[in-house]
């Protein structure tokens, strides 16, 4: 019989946030695959868990995944944990899950802590729709592309950042997105947990006197939909009317329908467009 891969969420700071189900599973499985065994041994020792461990991290995630899947196919049950939070959420996990599905190995996820959701729910920002970006790319070109995409993102944006990169990241976001409001969460669930509601400029001013410390989650307001619509309308209004018509007619849209679309874009009636085209 094939074993099961258990994705086990671990605390992001406060050890009391671990679930009874995760503790039971970590004790019952045959092997625990940990992102960093040196960190995870502290968690296991605290809860007196003696299950053997092996490393599974960013730099061995493919080769090691196949080794672990082979053990699963032999009938072994394996738990996957990361240093903090839920496997696969800005941490190793997605690759071994994909390989398990390809090999017909069962996977189940044991819910628990995730810094992005913890920060979002207490941010005071809209929670119904959000875009999780984790850490922005370090590659300069890719980073610029992602930040450019965020300019017109209307959903709440969640970004992770380390203290030594915080000022650089906030400065880049400020320059690209404007002075947005955000909630800054630091050291979540830990003794020195801190939440600050500010704008990018206020956060940069604050950083002049307070050196960034700890891990950060930035929960940023999305762009206002009405603002985007207004900007788009102004863009259409600046375009010559015939060029605006040609924009739609070049797509195979007949002139009558194109007039309707142009009128909508410009916030005027179809009759107004007709008169201007005479």
Question: For each predicted feature, which ranges?
Answer:
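Loop/turn-to-beta-strand initiation segments
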Residues: 3-5, 75-79, 155-156
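Glycine-centered tight-turn and secondary-structure capping sites
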Residues: 92-94, 255
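Class I SAM-dependent methyltransferase SAM-binding "motif I" and its flanking Rossmann-like core
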Residues: 95-153
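Short glycine-rich anion-binding loops that position phosphate/pyrophosphate groups of nucleotides
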Residues: 12-13, 83-87, 163-165, 223-225
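A contiguous loop/helix-start segment that scaffolds small-molecule binding in enzyme catalytic cores
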Residues: 2, 156, 163-278
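Short active-site oxyanion
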Residues: 26-32, 104-108, 156-157
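Conserved helicase motor
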Residues: 56-62, 136-139
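Glycine-rich, flexible N-terminal cofactor/catalytic loop recognition
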Residues: 1-59
